[in-house]
Regions:
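Beta-lactam-recognizing serine transpeptidase/beta-lactamase-like catalytic domain environment
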Residues: 2-246, 251-485, 528-531
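Short, gly/Ser/Thr-rich active-site loops of penicillin-recognizing serine hydrolases
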Residues: 405-407, 411, 498-531
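Amphipathic oligomerization regions
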Residues: 485-504
Length: 531
């Protein structure tokens, strides 16, 4: 409280009596005012669409050469401030009165703003005003963790370090990924009945307590969800889109086989690098190589060079020479057959996935600008497994007050099985089976699973991990699509898929699942592109 009072006094001083240019401020004060301006824009008090970014005073602000007081006063004169949101008489107030009202608005709002308070706490920690040990004890005081006398005493007497304490709590999932809101902290999974297209499960993590938003909204709880850095209000199964990584190679295999640029027996040599285009892209195994692979083996090995070659051949098919647009047209054609350029038909909010629009060689391995939801990948792998492109539905039936069924719903579908011959489908399916049968995550697993992993890179962040598949391999009953955004490796998504399949077939109990520990909680994790 005293630190907050000091900070608010400092902000008030900057806004009124002793302004200084941004470039002379301490990092702490600069961060505070950066947040304040952002808050004003979010609240639509500072009208960002009205700001003339070519204005000389604005340029001085961007160059940190003027004070917040000078900038905000100038914003008022330029009508960049919506004074209707301030407690002033719009008709008669002069610029001084408007500025005073704006200052009061700022000071009132940051006093109760959680995100602004976090800036204060951050610098208190940096200065050593709050110790790591105190932070750990606060978790008990605030009810984040169940009180434990033994652990509290160990923290207090120094026999348990804050680092070891946190690592153990994370490992035991007493502190959850959602609470940390550090990558990775989100995930999604869709399980579908392969025979009917009925969605068996659709999971978005993190979630929230919907009971607090029904029959009267708990405003405090809703506000906490809105400010939660893990964005629990976003449905990660239907609304989040990322690159698909190598899960897209099943589309490329389909296109290559259907367009006869490869056969099921054709072999392509991987030397670790693809020399037929100017940027010479590498296989993930480089500086190693896969040698000769046919399409099934290329799916098993996730060989980039094989699928670069397929993309290049698709781009040359129409004219005999490379044409970017022609290659993309064919990739889009087969992505469309699998429904990847459409919404899936769900009755809830869903983002539309998007198929690559350029660079067919890179698009063929899931790069370029491919971007898909988890539910779209689910429909895609269901189509691969069944030869049917379903229009998904969440509604199962409607019943009246007496429990009598009024209406039943059933997913309709388009038969796409004639896209490939039975031997071509077999080649894709056997490749998917080999992916899983050679994967350490599935060793000793009694249920035969077929699947495809995908690792999608995102600049400046950990890789996304994806897995699509179906089980049992010989007579599929369910399909599954898993994405762990920024999950480092596709093998982490594959592990999650194995756990879901194991639970579905009652190989694992809920008790077993609840006793599972956090993978990688020892901090020894890194990006992997071996998918």
């Amino acid at each position: 409280k005293s630190r907050q009072k000091t900070t608010l006094g400092k902000i008030k001083q900057e806004l009124t009596s002793s302004p200084e240019a941004l470039n002379t401020m301490s990092d702490e004060v600069l961060d505070e005012f950066t947040y304040i301006i952002s808050m004003l824009k979010d609240d639509q008090v500072l009208l960002k669409n009205e700001i003339d970014t070519s204005d000389s005073v604005y340029q001085k602000w961007k160059d940190q050469k003027i004070s917040p007081k000078e900038y905000l006063n100038y914003c008022i004169t330029q009508h960049w401030i919506d004074i209707s949101q301030l407690n002033v008489d719009e008709k008669y107030a002069d610029s001084t009165e408007v500025y005073d009202a704006l200052c009061k608005y700022i000071l009132k709002n940051i006093k109760t703003d959680t995100e602004f308070s976090k800036i204060i706490y951050q610098y208190m920690i940096t200065r050593g005003e709050i110790s790591p040990r105190q932070l750990c004890l606060i978790l008990f005081d605030q009810g984040v963790l169940d009180y434990d006398d033994a652990t509290v005493n160990k923290l207090k007497n120094g026999s348990l370090s804050p680092r070891d304490f946190l690592m153990k709590k994370i490992y035991n999932i007493e502190i959850t990924p959602a609470q940390l809101a550090l990558e990775p902290c989100t995930g999604s999974c869709v399980v579908t009945d392969e025979k009917t297209g009925e969605i068996r499960a659709m999971v978005s993590y993190p979630g929230y307590n919907s009971n607090k938003l029904a029959n009267g909204v708990d405003s405090e709880y809703f506000a906490s969800l809105q400010h939660d850095k893990s964005s629990p209000l976003l449905n990660y199964a239907t609304q989040q889109k990322t690159a698909p990584g190598s899960t897209f190679k099943l589309v490329s295999a389909t296109a290559g086989l259907a367009e006869n640029v490869i056969t099921t027996s054709d072999q392509i040599r991987c030397t670790g690098i693809y020399n037929d285009i100017s940027n010479k892209p590498k296989c993930w195994i480089y500086p190693g190589s896969h040698g000769l692979d046919n399409v099934s083996e290329a799916i098993r090995d996730s060989c980039n060079v094989f699928f670069y070659t397929v993309g290049n051949r698709l781009a040359q098919k129409k004219t005999g020479s490379y044409n970017d647009a022609n290659g993309i047209d064919l990739i889009q054609k087969y992505a469309h057959i699998y429904g990847l350029d459409q919404k899936t038909g769900l009755e809830i909010s869903e983002s539309k996935s998007s198929v690559a629009t350029k660079y067919p060689v890179m698009a063929a391995i899931g790069q370029s600008d491919n971007n898909y939801t988890t539910v779209a990948l689910s429909r895609y792998v269901t189509a691969v497994a069944s030869g049917k492109k379903y229009n998904y539905q969440l509604m199962n039936k409607i019943v009246d007050a007496d429990g009598k069924t009024v209406k039943k719903y059933k997913a309709d579908y388009e038969d796409i099985s004639d896209t490939l011959t039975s031997s071509q489908w077999d080649a894709i399916h056997s490749g998917m089976r080999e992916v899983v049968s050679t994967m350490d995550r599935f060793q000793g697993f009694d249920i035969p699973v077929a699947g495809k992993t995908g690792t999608a890179q995102q600049t400046g962040h950990a890789n996304h991990g994806l897995f699509v598949g179906y089980a049992p391999y010989d007579d599929p009953e369910i399909t599954i699509a898993v994405r762990i955004a920024n999950g480092y490796s596709s093998h982490n998504a594959a592990t999650a898929a194995r756990n879901v399949i194991s639970y579905y077939y009652k190989e694992t109990s809920m008790k077993d699942i609840k006793e599972m520990k956090a993978a990688g909680a020892n901090g020894n994790i890194r990006n992997s592109v071996a998918d």
